[in-house]
């Protein structure tokens, strides 16, 4: 904290505990200030002991925006970046995803999918890139909503091009809370709630359903037979009959049920002048709306950072363990197609087994049986570790090296017991288990050189240059088998009959150069240029490099003297912006599409009797097969993004408007 006598240069700095001593005249006014807090003026009035409490300046905190590989003053931004308040996230039961809907222009959320300014790939993924505490592709590493400090949405090429191929669909940048100098602070939050499906499909009751089915049969019968009076009006076997209803079932209510959830999170933070920390844990327990799953999730996390002289260091760890137990296999569509006059259970409590659906003779299986009997089990663990070291070469020049590694392991299993549901498609004379195991790893190494220099108090030049490498690897194994002995989850050896084993493995890599330069004249005229060069292993040599530049300019009209003279009483900020950029994407291309892929499969070969010898039978043998042919011309998808816009703040920042037009 800085303490000065108002109107003078007489001042001092507080100590570690916030105390200070300053010799002043008895009628002085002192000004106490600290970065991120509102300054406070206090009249001494002859006193020798003062207690001062500063309030957080939320407006000032909003003035610094996290951008790609750095931060920037909001007033100097020339690109389309939206900020979402963490308070809005806490108000939304669905977290960040739901909070973005309707609160951020150009962002559409539907079915849990986020789309920033529409679709940017023809066939590939259109999900945005998540960057958490500077770590790319880390959407699953946010401990809980209470740990969020800031959220920025990068929407245009001018802001996303610095991420190259990874930022083709927009970028969501999340910064989590860090520890601060001071005594340990403990925070605990507990949540509990319930939910229900309020949007219900209105279905016909049994009588109306039977009438409509009979009408269907009447209207679809042979016209000549009806004209000649030979049409048989007897209801076909198995078809709903108004005079003989079997029951009255609301299949929607049978399929869905209420949701109950609870969540707890605990955090501890603190530190000294040399190091600070924030550690915590979260537990969540949730069952879904189809009484099929109970999901439990636990995570632990820690953030540590410190400064010694010109050297700054830090690290972040996050680990997550989730387990799901429940049932699966039921189809909502098939459930709703089940006639409402059919019951779920027989009088003895056993499941009612249906035959055809009463309309076209198609097999109809009691879907509620699957909700009670087809078992699902999932176990997954993921972890991330990141460390960095930063040295201040000069006051205006820093070098940072960051290493991040994350991995995930999963074990999924599905068990279907022996059953006979009364139809050809509803019979299985054995117990079957399918197990899928997999793992993945992701390594990131970043070398960044950042600079920020001001000349003659009005010319500011800042930016970053760097080299980034990424490696991905993964594997999966699937085993399915049958057993007439075991009807519960167990090792694969319990299900030895008709075993089928599949496996796969992959590797993927990127190597990138990046640069951003921003020039500002007195925070009035701004220009920013970004450049990213990406090399991807998805393409053949010769096509692997993609080059993606972007440019943006800004003009703060409100800082012009002629504008200030006319509007100073009500206009706080008016900034015009224009952007142009190109972003690349490799999402639509498979890892090995540029090469011929050979697989082993069973095919008919002329090793024995064949078509040449009609009296024999073709031989079915396992042999190599080209699954797809090489396409060496595959290259990058490229999106060109151009836009103009303005930012307007009026009436002491009580009214704000952001407008963007883009193509």
Regions found by a protein language model. Name each.
Residues 126-127, 262, 297, 303-321, ...:
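Extracellular/periplasmic, surface-exposed regions of secreted and cell-surface proteins
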Residues 32, 130, 344-345, 519:
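Short aromatic-centered micro-motifs
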Residues 201-234, 320-359, 414, 473, ...:
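A surface-exposed, glycine/aromatic-enriched loop/edge motif typical of exported proteins
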Residues 237-243, 422, 497, 536:
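Extracytoplasmic gating/loop element in the C-terminal half of outer-membrane beta-barrel translocons
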Residues 161-164, 332, 565-567:
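Short proline/glycine-enriched turn/loop segments at secondary-structure junctions
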Residues 196, 253-255, 334, 569-572:
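C-terminal beta-signal and adjacent terminal beta-strands/loops
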């Amino acid at each position: 904290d800085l303490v000065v006598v108002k109107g003078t240069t007489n001042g001092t700095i507080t100590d570690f505990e916030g105390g200070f001593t300053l010799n002043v005249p008895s009628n002085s006014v002192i000004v106490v200030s600290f970065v991120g807090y509102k300054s406070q003026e206090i009249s001494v009035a002859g006193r020798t002991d003062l207690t001062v409490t500063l309030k957080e300046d939320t407006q000032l905190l909003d003035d610094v925006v996290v951008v790609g590989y750095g931060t920037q003053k909001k007033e100097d931004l020339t690109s389309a970046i939206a900020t979402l308040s963490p308070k809005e996230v806490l108000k939304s039961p669905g977290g960040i995803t739901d909070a973005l809907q309707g609160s951020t222009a150009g962002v559409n959320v539907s079915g849990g999918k986020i789309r920033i300014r529409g679709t940017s790939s023809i066939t590939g993924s259109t999900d945005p890139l998540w960057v958490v505490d500077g770590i790319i592709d880390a959407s699953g590493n946010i401990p809980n909503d209470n740990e969020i400090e800031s959220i920025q949405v990068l929407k245009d090429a001018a802001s996303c091009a610095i991420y190259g191929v990874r930022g083709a669909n927009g970028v969501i940048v999340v910064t989590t809370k860090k520890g601060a100098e001071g005594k340990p602070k403990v925070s605990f939050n507990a949540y509990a709630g319930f939910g229900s499906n309020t949007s219900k499909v209105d279905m016909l009751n049994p009588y109306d359903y039977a009438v409509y089915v009979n009408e269907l049969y009447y209207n679809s019968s042979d016209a000549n037979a009806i004209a000649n009076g030979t049409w048989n009006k007897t209801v076909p076997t198995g078809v709903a009959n108004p005079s003989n209803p079997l029951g009255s079932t609301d299949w929607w209510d049978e399929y869905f049920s209420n949701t109950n959830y609870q969540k707890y999170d605990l955090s501890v933070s603190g530190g000294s002048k040399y190091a600070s920390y924030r550690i915590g844990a979260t537990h969540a327990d949730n069952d879904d709306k189809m009484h099929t799953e109970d999901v439990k999730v636990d995570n632990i996390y820690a953030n540590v950072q410190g400064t010694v002289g010109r050297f700054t260091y830090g690290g972040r760890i996050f680990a997550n363990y989730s387990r799901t137990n429940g049932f699966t296999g039921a189809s909502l569509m098939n459930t709703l197609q089940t006639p409402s006059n059919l019951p779920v259970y027989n009088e003895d409590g056993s499941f009612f087994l249906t035959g055809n659906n009463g309309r076209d003779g198609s097999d109809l299986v009691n879907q509620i049986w699957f909700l009670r009997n087809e078992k699902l089990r999932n176990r997954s663990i993921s972890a991330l570790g990141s460390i960095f070291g930063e040295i201040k070469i000069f006051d205006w020049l820093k070098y940072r090296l960051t290493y991040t590694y994350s991995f995930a392991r999963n074990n999924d299993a599905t068990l279907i017991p022996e059953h006979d549901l009364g139809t050809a498609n509803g019979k299985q004379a054995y117990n079957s288990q399918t197990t899928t195991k997999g793992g993945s790893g992701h390594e990131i190494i970043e070398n960044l050189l950042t600079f920020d220099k001001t000349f003659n108090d009005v010319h500011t030049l800042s930016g970053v240059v760097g080299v980034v490498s990424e490696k991905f690897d993964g594997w999966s194994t699937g085993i399915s088998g049958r057993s007439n002995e075991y009807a519960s989850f167990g090792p694969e050896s319990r299900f030895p009959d008709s075993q089928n084993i599949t496996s796969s493995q992959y590797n993927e890599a990127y190597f990138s150069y990046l640069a951003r330069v921003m020039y500002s004249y007195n925070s009035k005229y701004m220009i920013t240029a970004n450049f990213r060069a990406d090399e991807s292993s998805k393409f053949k040599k010769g096509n692997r490099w993609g080059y993606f530049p972007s440019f943006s300019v800004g003009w703060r009209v409100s800082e012009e003297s002629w504008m200030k003279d006319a509007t100073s009483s009500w206009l706080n900020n008016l900034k015009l912006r224009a952007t142009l950029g190109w972003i690349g994407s490799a999402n639509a291309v498979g890892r090995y599409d540029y090469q011929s892929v050979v697989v082993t499969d069973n095919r008919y070969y002329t090793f024995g009797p064949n078509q040449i010898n009609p009296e024999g039978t073709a031989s079915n043998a396992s042999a190599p097969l080209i699954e797809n042919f090489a396409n060496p011309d595959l290259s990058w998808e490229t999106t060109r993004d151009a836009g103009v816009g303005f930012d307007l703040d009026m009436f002491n920042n009580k009214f704000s408007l952001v407008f963007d037009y883009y193509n």
